[in-house]
Amino acid sequence: SKSGTDLDRPLSALVYTAFDTETTGLQPSGGDEIIQIGALRVADGELCPDDTFEKLIDPGRPIHPESLAVHGISDTMVRGKPAIGAVLPDFHRFCEQSVLLGHNIAFDMRFLQIKERATGVIFSQQILDTLLLSAVAYPNQEHHSLESSMDLLGVSIDHRHSALSDAAATARVFLKLLPLLAERGIITLGQAIEASKKRPMPA
């Protein structure tokens, strides 16, 4: 629920769904589509490796070569997979009772929100962006890409750039940020959301 009570709860006491999407390209309003969603649960201050969601999605359109170079998901790999309209209800159920966690999560949320009318699936959960939280914890750092945040915090992951491994990297970054945020007096979900809003958007 998006109830006010969650806002007063300590970050360490909440349940999260860390997630990432891979897409055909970078322009959701220009018709780009999600081709993979990967997510995993974070609870009691740790990753839940058995509680994951991973789906390939047929976008019904070609994948841009630049995007293919990043995620390695080809047209052949997604052809005949379920359409987004079939996957989003399942994903929504998976993350229903949790705070959504992503790195530059605004990008992923735009892709989800643009589908609201067509699918009737509305993601109204609280959200936290590890990119913004990394900028709060490291105000003098210039770069806050997922790679930069991983380097800063000593997080390593086996395979980068599948949606699920990026979700796992995001979750690990988040858990490493918690004590650094606490040092800055940021303990509750509400405080983390407020601190994120005050940050100028880093590059």
Indicate where each model-derived feature is located:
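Acidic two-metal-ion nuclease catalytic site recognized across multiple nuclease folds
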Residues: 1-10, 171, 175-203
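Conserved beta-strand -> loop -> alpha-helix junction used to position metal-binding or nucleic-acid-contacting
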Residues: 122-134
